[in-house]
Amino acid sequence: MSGHRSTRKRCGDSHPESPVGFGHMSTTGCVLNKLFQLPTPPLSRHQLKRLEEHRYQSAGRSLLEPLMQGYWEWLVGRVPSWIAPNLITIIGLSINICTTILLVFYCPTATEQAPLWAYIACACGLFIYQSLDAIDGKQARRTNSSSPLGELFDHGCDSLSTVFVVLGTCIAVQLGTNPDWMFFCCFAGTFMFYCAHWQTYVSGTLRFGIIDVTEVQIFIIIMHLLAVIGGPPFWQSMIPVLNIQMKLLPALCTVAGTIFSCTNYFRVIFTGGVGKNGSTIAGTSVLSPFLHIGSVITLAVMIYKKSAVQLFEKHPCLYILTFGFVSAKITNKLVVAHMTKSEMHLHDTAFIGPALLFLDQYFNSFIDEYIVLWIALIFSFFDLIRYCVSVCNQIASHLHIHVFRIKASTAHSNHH
């Protein structure tokens, strides 16, 4: 899933005082703020300066986008002008995550059948996220609250949503019965999203394909509804001629989509560098971002195949979420590198979680792998949130704006 249409929409807002931007913090708020803040600012003074100079550039449009524009325009017209674009995005993301967690709760191995209402909730949650994610930029332009932080915030939410969307899809079709296929589909989704921003880091322009995130999301919503209508018998039925189970059809579509998308991405990566001698926008090697995503996938494959207790097969959802949080963080760092025209460094605390799993296996599972997986999951999630909060706060402070609140002067002028 390429997952990047939404950024055409806006560039939101932020806050110098706190992650949420609701004014003065209580003592509890101060403690939480320190807990979720990095000890040192993640961005340098030069990066912040270059961030100010960043201008969003995009090219192309997807198949369904023109058809959906009427609905999106109608929807944004129903939103009060005092609601901040980033608040719209985070509400949609929260709904998307909560509905997917319902499926994870009922189907921890992606082989079980959840209550029918859970699939309906997941389909609705994804549609709500897709809708809100599409109008946040329109709201930003409508309220004159566009800023570089909004673009970063939007990409960050998309990077996390991608993890939950692909996981929810695998659960809906009960792909846990085919662990290799489930592994491929989940990591292909996060890899394609990363590549979309990799080629942006190289060329300076975010490109949209004819089949993009809107089309993929509609397809996934349909699959959730098919899980309601047909249930397990539908996904277990055989496809004539091909002689494969119906559940493998989405997986084969993922293979085709990955080949098609990556062909376009790597054509830009190898030939579209706008820096000196065809380098990235930051003047670095066009291949340097591969080290990060390559390390994540390599560790994921090694731990999956070397596990003596079938860690992935027994706990696929926890496994995907753990590595998904790691992928989301390095994707966010890639977006930051693009927007600040700076180099990506390989050393990162994001790799600590996977490293714990790797070392535990190296020492013959000195600690139960399941316990280490939970530790890695919690650490990776905390590490991701801490980085995102710190970056948002620092940029907000620098730009003198709010994360989830529109400045009173801006809101007042637009109200009239």
Curated annotation (Swiss-Prot):
Site (Increases basicity of active site His) location in chain: E151
InterPro entries reported for this sequence: CDP-OH_P_trans, CDP-OH_PTrfase_TM_dom, CDP_ALCOHOL_P_TRANSF_CS, CHOPT
Residues passing through the membrane, by range: 89-108, 116-133, 156-176, 180-199, 210-230, 246-267, 286-306, 315-334, 349-363, 368-388
Catalyzed reactions: CDP-ethanolamine + a 1,2-diacyl-sn-glycerol = a 1,2-diacyl-sn-glycero-3-phosphoethanolamine + CMP + H(+); CDP-choline + a 1,2-diacyl-sn-glycerol = a 1,2-diacyl-sn-glycero-3-phosphocholine + CMP + H(+); 1-O-alkyl-2-acyl-sn-glycerol + CDP-choline = a 1-O-alkyl-2-acyl-sn-glycero-3-phosphocholine + CMP + H(+); a 1-O-(1Z-alkenyl)-2-acyl-sn-glycerol + CDP-choline = a 1-O-(1Z-alkenyl)-2-acyl-sn-glycero-3-phosphocholine + CMP + H(+)
Residues bearing glycans: N144
This protein's pathway: Phospholipid metabolism; phosphatidylethanolamine biosynthesis; phosphatidylethanolamine from ethanolamine: step 3/3; Phospholipid metabolism; phosphatidylcholine biosynthesis; phosphatidylcholine from phosphocholine: step 2/2
Cofactor: Mg(2+); Mn(2+)
Enzyme Commission (EC) number: 2.7.8.1, 2.7.8.2, 2.7.8.22
Binding-site residues for Mg(2+) 2, renumbered to this chain: D133, D154, D158
Record key words, sorted: Endoplasmic reticulum, Glycoprotein, Lipid biosynthesis, Lipid metabolism, Magnesium, Manganese, Membrane, Metal-binding, Nucleus, Phospholipid biosynthesis, Phospholipid metabolism, Phosphoprotein, Transferase, Transmembrane, Transmembrane helix
Single GO BP term: phosphatidylethanolamine biosynthetic process
Family: Belongs to the CDP-alcohol phosphatidyltransferase class-I family.
Assembly and interaction partners: Homodimer.
Protein name listed in UniProt: Choline/ethanolaminephosphotransferase 1
Species this chain originates from: Mus musculus
Gene: Cept1
